[in-house]
């Protein structure tokens, strides 16, 4: 994950209860509003509410890689509020109007940086639970790409989140994902070759999400592209399959024609049905 990811995929419409208004959501955010995270960091946010009196189910939106801001979640905000969801979106720490320092993620610093990003996402959940407009018992986490590492950590830190929805999110260690991405951009073209080369990798692994996924009791749904050249989809599914055998409520949908960017129309209905089970 070497670049910021576009958010055209973000037309996700999760219908899991609450009012289903036809009109756009309304902002509930004072100018310059922030909420606190760890280490004195304050995160600039927007909280978008559907029409109606609430309390509303809510989603905390997690970032992909890069210097992303709350404005890059506008599409998901519009879709979610139309279906009765509140959406909390915020500038990544060290980006936009949020304080703190921005860092990219690598094998050496990954555990620390991803932990900080998870602290921020969990702080968003805690913030929502202080708001009278929000049903604190119906909060879910959603994200793309890098959020595949962040969301399981955030779910550990935020008890009672109802579900996780991850689009193109890896379950492999950071070092392995970076190595795969480098190979895919280089001379290794076939997925059999890529998988074989991954098995030979002897470099630093860095942060590994698997132990955290093993310890969670939060249902999760992954949408994955078979042609993804950013994350190793085969290995991600292998890990999810193994975790399912130990009783974890993890499932996935593999889209054969697509890579890292899966058109929203391909998965929105399934995502909505999944979230509808957590009223």
Please describe what each predicted stretch is:
Residues 153, 157-196:
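Hydrolase active-site cap/lid region
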Residues 216, 222-224, 228:
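Short beta-strand/loop motif that positions the catalytic acidic residue
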